[in-house]
Amino acid sequence: MFVPVGSEQDFPSVSTLLLPAISVGNVGQLAIDLIISTLNIPKVGYFYTDCLVPMVGNNPYETNEENAKELCTNAEVYALPSQKLAVLQLRSLVIKKKSKSFRQALVSWIKRCAFARVIFLSSCHAYHRDDKQLFGTPFRYLVTPALQKSVADVLSELEWKEMEKVSSYPELNDNEKKLFIPGGGFTKAFYNDCCLEDLQMAVVLKFCSEGDNVPDAFSLLNQVNEWLHLVEPTNGDVKWKSPRSWRLLFGSGLPPAIF
């Protein structure tokens, strides 16, 4: 599944892996773009898989004419050994009938690379919130039992809120509750897989709606940065660098000739 660029890629055993869900507003994917662009993380490989919709495009993080000619594919891995950080960017949809196969391959690769922890950036439909979720922070987190003990104090200090379970049958049986992440793609299934495989994994997500989700990506990343300290703030603010490809997120502007 993983094909290294050049020689076989070894990740430091204490590396943190960040990856996105393909979820509402593409918030996780946009946040991953910001991380790669800001830290200028080099590409170390890609995933060769038939579980994702095929795609190819120009280098989204180009900084000069030379690297502008590079191509990108649907799943690429970036690594920054100095910060013990690895990043997987997903750029196309998981084929529905192959979701389980993709998750299994992903879990297998994570175990083989022996990542110390996995941070999964996701989003969830805001209109599905219950009355309690309408108030306070729009961010939620989930951690697997394997990670719970080591991060419980930190997340409590940050005053993060855990994703609530909701009633399976509201107003009929409130005793039976389940995890519900509408619009979260394979977030719930991947979280359950990591629990079963005893992986140290956390989900950080934001309630949002479809539209211009760039502000959601910035805010989600600021939330994650409070915990991971990926970028140190300058004068109280973290300066994230948008990739140049974002100039085309909504196409070109209106031609002046039409006015």
From Swiss-Prot:
Summarize what the UniProt record says about post-translational modification: Degraded by the proteasome upon completion of 20S proteasome maturation.
User: What's in the GO CC field?
Assistant: cytosol; nucleus
Where is it chiefly localized?
nucleus
Against Gene3D superfamilies, the record matches this protein to: PAC-like subunit
Q: Mention any Pfam family matching this sequence.
A: PAC2
Q: Which InterPro entries does its entry note?
A: Proteasome_assmbl_chaperone_2, Proteasome_assmbl_chp_2_euk, PSMG2_sf
Read off the SUPFAM superfamilies from this record. Answer: Cgl1923-like
Intracellular or extracellular location(s): Nucleus
| One of the GO biological process terms | chaperone-mediated protein complex assembly
**What family classification does the UniProt entry report for this protein?**
Belongs to the PSMG2 family.
Q: What is the protein name given in its UniProt record?
A: Proteasome assembly chaperone 2
Organism annotation:
Xenopus laevis
Supply the gene name. psmg2
